[in-house]
Amino acid sequence: GYTITDVIVDGKSQGPKDSYEFKNIRENHTLEVKVAKLLTGDHIAYIKGYPDGGVHPTANITRAEVSAIFYRLLSDDARSVYTTNIHNFTDVHNSWASTEISTLTNAGILKGYTDGSFRPDAAITRAEFAAIAARFDKLSGGNKTFSDVPTDHWAYAAITSAAEKGWVNGYSDGTFRPDNAITRAEVVKITNAVLMRTCDKDYVADNLSKLISYNDLTSAYWAYYDIHEASNAHDYKVVNDAEIWINLK
């Protein structure tokens, strides 16, 4: 069976349930069942490097590449329910990530543009990525706002919710810079936060020669450990809220 995360009846959440009984039926009712979409317990490798041996942490990342990352991270239940090659985008048919884009769109995670395009090869922006991350969880209000994200900004709710959860951060000048292209390192940092994945720094230090690592990544880089967390599949346990790696997969 599926792991059900929510049952929505007539637009109202009923919480996780194995079954739901309609009572006093006098008109048509709507029923929506949501399944867990992300692999939160299985720490697979979801980021890959390049043939030159680098991971290019400061490079931009395309909308297709982000689609591929989250496709790898889909739970088995979500794959079973949402996998498809059907889409309505005008520019995805020949994309290498057509299945990934179609599936995540079917799951309600990805959205295209008003002109009918998806723009798979375009660099994804900070606002767009925050919106994608936010769709994996319920939106929450909060006091974390940014000077360049007004309340009428299309991604205001997603950005402020993600900031409240600690998934995204702004800059020291109080801005979020929503239209800036997000970097690969920033994507990994946010994705790990969404998945509640934290790197075992001691394990990395003691076993570096066994790990997938990169020639453009030094231990002084701010996302060094996050990138190792995302690049190396591993078994782990949690001790005192800290992730302890047991072995590599």
Predicted regions and their residues:
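Surface-exposed interfaces of beta-sheet-rich extracellular modules
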Residues: 1-21
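Feature responds to low-complexity, polar/acidic, surface-exposed segments characteristic
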Residues: 16-18, 34-99, 106-127, 134-158, ...
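Solvent-exposed segments in extracellular or luminal domains encompassing
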Residues: 20-28
